[in-house]
């Protein structure tokens, strides 16, 4: 039989991985996408400035998503809101693969950012729900390490994905 301390460590590790992946959704929408910018530009037949707007729209969405979904998760529950926005994120990401008009693509990138920002704020709020004081500080530091590793690997993953498939 596992001790309480072992169960707590196992729970904390699973929570760290889960929330680490959640906090990485926002940066992943940018970092995995960057290697494909020249290909996206060619496919849309757009200027460099127009394609750079896809990053701007995503960043604006990331910022606004935190302001929108933080209070919503406080009011309606973290899990309900997180699951809803993850579903939206996945659907929007799938739709963006089939879009051939830049204005619609910009809209989808904004929604990706919005939902990515929502997941980030919910992940951090969830950590605050589970921990406090020094334990929270240690957990958030570990969360940032996971997020940092994912952020470093994302452009590599994006480049690799681009080498075997299209954007």
Positions of PLM-derived features:
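Extracellular/periplasmic helix-loop-helix junction of adjacent transmembrane segments
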Residues: 36-63
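Interfacial helix-cap and linker-helix signal at transmembrane-aqueous boundaries
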Residues: 40-41, 72-73, 160-165
